[in-house]
Amino acid sequence: FTSFTLEEIKSLDAGSWYVNTDPHGEIAAGNISQKDLDSFIGLKVPTVTEAIELTQKLNWKVNLELKIQPEAMKNFPMVDHILVEIERLHFPKDQFVISSFNHAWLKEVQKKKPEYQIEALVGYPELEVDAIKWRDFEFKSYNVNRKLTTPEEIRDVTNKGYEIGLFNIDSKADFVQFIEAGTTRIITDYPQIMTGMGYHR
């Protein structure tokens, strides 16, 4: 994707594919209104700056995930770039967290901006080494692939004072047992299930 210019990316329709393919069956299940479906058509890919500005406008809290880059961009100064944008836009620190599978980047953020909240991602690709490594507890807060843990382990870890969030968690049964076990946050493709259970973003 590094061969695309920003202008080319901004020309794309980033929403119609969802309406046309219904990848998770949510349209067929009647969980998305026609008004929302109509709003998907012609959606544009936002820049990081545009996303932060919208987050500020709507008073949301956002997870800024620093994505591992392809080989052609391995020397891109990811941490410096995002920190500069945060400062330039006067983004309040209580409105965002910074997360990444690249734990070296998170350590760099900690060093340069210790007041920022960070969350270490674990579990992609789904290798056994990841299942072992995250338990070294280099960080206070983790987001772990649900496939790599159990409610019993979450209960044990949170009782030790660590914050554990889960991703790749999409069933109501999992929501219930992991919330009861003490998970701090849920990252899911089905927030409407959580809303129906009385939880909110």
Q: Where in this protein do the model-derived segments appear?
A:
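Metal-dependent phosphodiesterase/phospholipase catalytic core, i.e.
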Residues: 1-117, 137-138, 160
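C-terminal active-site rim and adjoining tail of enzyme catalytic domains
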Residues: 119-201
